[in-house]
Amino acid sequence: KNSETIEVRILKKVFLAVILGIIFFLAIFFVKSVKRSHPLEQTSYALGTILHFQIWGKEANQALEKALSRIHDIEVHMSTHDPNSDIYKVNVSSGSSFVPVHEDTFYVVEKAIDYAYKSSGTFEPTIGGLVNLWRIGTPEERLPSEEEIANAVSLIGYEEVQLDRKNMSIRLPRSGQHLDLGGIAKGYAADEVVAILKRKGIKSALVDLGGNIFVLGTKPDSTLWNVGVQNPLEPRGQYLGVLRVSNKSVVTSGNYERFFEKDGKRYHHIFDPATGYPAESGLLSVTILSDRSIDGDALSTA
């Protein structure tokens, strides 16, 4: 009887250990599942716009930290207002010498000029003079005189931008010419963010850089992402339709985003390089679905 009692006790202890082990592993699985089901969400401000992120994965915090640092670097290189930026230095040196730039800047300017050629100049990276003249979206927005506009238009010319790949430098040949990468830099930044997320093993994320949206993978439940396309004639949040996508960039540009009104006429921020005035193409909004956000950004602006 004593022998049987000892065996029973041993069996009970083994059984209890097995049960506790199962409970322990189930608890770990549950905690991990909960972590996976709730994204890291953050809203920031950079590149002149509001940024929003939803990231799932155990490396989400580290990935977001690196992504924000990368965005900051891009902004530092391509700002038109920061005296330390490449673009600022190129602009103030227009009519003078070549200016050495970071490889990020050189790549984006090269892509911008490529899209200028492909669009026959409707996408125009040397439009900086017009942007500075109108100042739409700032407290100093204004309606320039016809003479001011004509002068700014005369300085536009993507064909004139000189690129020296060997020395990674850029030159604007005429004094007063100005680059502005506002129509393409956010797209480049979005692509760089997605590359960082992938390197960190992130499988599911939504990146929104002020309307430049990139959805990585699918949602955590394996369904496609739903990306709404804003109705330009309705208040924000009213959609023309919803795109169901994965691993895609969705970029929308519209004349409803930044504008001012004077004497009953609306002046928006998308310019026609040929006239110097806000474009009157008849299009209120353009949405581009693409594999790379830099492409969608440029095409939606053109």
Question: How should each PLM-predicted stretch be described?
Answer:
Residues K1-A302:
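Mature catalytic core of soluble alpha/beta enzymes
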